[in-house]
């Protein structure tokens, strides 16, 4: 079993002389949920169907396109799994900012982008956001909350959350 022991950050500015290295790095992928990307020890399935293990330094949080490497040089790229999320889209940026404030005040790990925010689906939070006057779209999408929101939080307390 391959043991991935360290993280090699993905660079978006690959040049032609790095093409072979980049190709080798992306041959294998590991698709993980946000919760799985916060674990430093985890049994995973590689894109070729084989099992591997993550043995990363404690506190490592993986992001999409990060590359992990084994001691013998095998690399795999992390991809974000689609998850059931609630996404709030709005052109009213003040209202959207208020929703982000209220969600953050409840320590909800939150992905914040231009014109929208996203959190793991929770009907209680959806109701709160709708009471603010915003629409919530429940969808399957990749989820990458702002850094720091999930260190030791109570992210495992979602009633009715199934895998």
Curated annotation (Swiss-Prot):
Gene3D superfamilies found in the cross-reference section: Urease metallochaperone UreE, N-terminal domain, UreE, C-terminal domain
Location(s), subcellular: Cytoplasm
Stored InterPro entries: UreE, UreE_C_dom, UreE_N, UreE_N_sf
Pfam families associated with the record: UreE_C, UreE_N
Single GO molecular function: unfolded protein binding
Region (Disordered) residue spans: 144-163
Record's keyword terms, sorted: Chaperone, Cytoplasm, Nickel, Nickel insertion
SUPFAM superfamilies reported in the protein's UniProt record: Urease metallochaperone UreE, C-terminal domain, Urease metallochaperone UreE, N-terminal domain
Any Gene Ontology CC annotation: cytoplasm
One of the GO biological process terms: protein folding
NCBIfam families: PRK13261.1-1
Function: Involved in urease metallocenter assembly. Binds nickel. Probably functions as a nickel donor during metallocenter assembly.
Family, as annotated: Belongs to the UreE family.
Protein name in the entry: Urease accessory protein UreE
Phylogenetic classification of the source organism: Bacteria, Pseudomonadati, Pseudomonadota, Gammaproteobacteria, Vibrionales
């Amino acid at each position: 079993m391959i043991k991935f022991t360290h993280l090699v950050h993905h660079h978006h500015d690959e040049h032609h002389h790095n093409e072979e290295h980049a190709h080798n790095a992306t041959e294998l992928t590991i698709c993980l949920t946000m919760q799985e990307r916060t674990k430093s020890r985890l049994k995973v399935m590689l894109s070729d169907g084989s099992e591997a293990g993550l043995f990363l330094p404690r506190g490592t949080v993986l992001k999409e396109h990060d590359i992990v490497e084994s001691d013998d040089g095998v690399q795999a790229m992390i991809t974000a799994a689609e998850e059931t999320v609630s996404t709030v889209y709005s052109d009213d940026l003040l209202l959207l900012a208020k929703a982000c404030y209220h969600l953050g005040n409840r320590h909800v790990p939150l992905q914040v982008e231009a014109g929208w925010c996203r959190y793991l689906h929770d009907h209680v939070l959806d109701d709160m956001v709708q009471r603010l006057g915003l629409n919530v779209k429940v969808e399957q999408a990749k989820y990458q909350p702002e850094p720091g929101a999930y260190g030791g939080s109570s992210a495992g307390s979602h009633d009715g959350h199934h895998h």
